[in-house]
C-alpha cells in the first residue's frame, strides 16, 4: 500500500518527468529487451533493433498507462482494469516480465534524474511499480 509520502513522491517525480514519459518508456522497454532477452518473445512482430519506432511507440503506451495510474493512485485497480484483462487473458504475459520492466524503468529514471532520485523517491517508485504490477497480474488467478 502506498503511503501518503509515497504518493507525494510518485506524483512529484512524474510531474518532473513531464513530456519525457513516452521517451523514457521507450528507453526502458529497449533496456528490458537488451537486459532480459526472453522478454522479446512477446513481440515477434516488432522490429526490436535499437531506436526502433515500434519499441518507442509501445514504450509510450507503457508510459501513458503509468501516467493514468499516477492520476488514480487511490484506485489503481479500477484505472488499470482493462489493461489487466488484456495482459492476463489476451496477451498472457508472464507476470515476471512486469518486474523486469519495472527495474528497467527505475534505472532509466535514475539515469535521467539523478539528483531527484533520492533513496526515498527510489523506494516510493519501486512500491508504485510493484503495486501496478500486482494490479496488472491480479486477473491471472
From Swiss-Prot:
The modification Phosphothreonine is found at residues 8, 108, 134, 137. Heme b binds at residue 87. Keywords: Acetylation, Heme, Iron, Metal-binding, Oxygen transport, Phosphoprotein, Transport. Red blood cells. The modification N6-acetyllysine is found at residue 16. One of its GO terms (molecular function) is organic acid binding. The modification Phosphoserine is found at residues 3, 35, 49, 102, 124, 138. The modification Phosphotyrosine is found at residue 24. GO terms for biological process: hydrogen peroxide catabolic process. The keyword Amino-acid biosynthesis does not apply. Disulfide bonds: none annotated. Belongs to the globin family. Heterotetramer of two alpha chains and two beta chains. This is Hemoglobin subunit alpha. It comes from Martes foina. The lineage of its organism: Eukaryota, Metazoa, Chordata, Craniata, Vertebrata. The gene is HBA.
Amino acid at each position: 500500500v502506498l503511503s501518503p509520502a509515497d504518493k507525494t513522491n510518485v506524483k512529484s517525480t512524474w510531474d518532473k518527468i513531464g513530456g519525457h514519459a513516452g521517451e523514457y518508456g521507450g528507453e526502458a522497454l529497449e533496456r528490458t529487451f537488451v537486459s532480459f532477452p526472453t522478454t522479446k518473445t512477446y513481440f515477434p512482430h516488432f522490429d526490436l533493433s535499437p531506436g526502433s519506432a515500434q519499441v518507442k511507440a509501445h514504450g509510450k503506451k507503457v508510459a501513458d498507462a503509468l501516467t493514468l495510474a499516477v492520476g488514480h493512485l487511490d484506485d489503481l485497480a479500477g484505472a488499470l482494469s482493462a489493461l489487466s484483462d488484456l495482459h492476463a487473458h489476451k496477451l498472457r504475459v508472464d507476470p515476471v516480465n512486469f518486474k523486469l520492466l519495472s527495474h528497467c524503468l527505475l534505472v532509466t529514471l535514475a539515469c535521467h534524474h539523478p539528483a531527484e532520485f533520492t533513496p526515498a523517491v527510489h523506494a516510493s517508485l519501486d512500491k508504485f511499480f510493484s503495486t501496478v504490477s500486482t494490479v496488472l497480474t491480479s486477473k491471472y488467478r
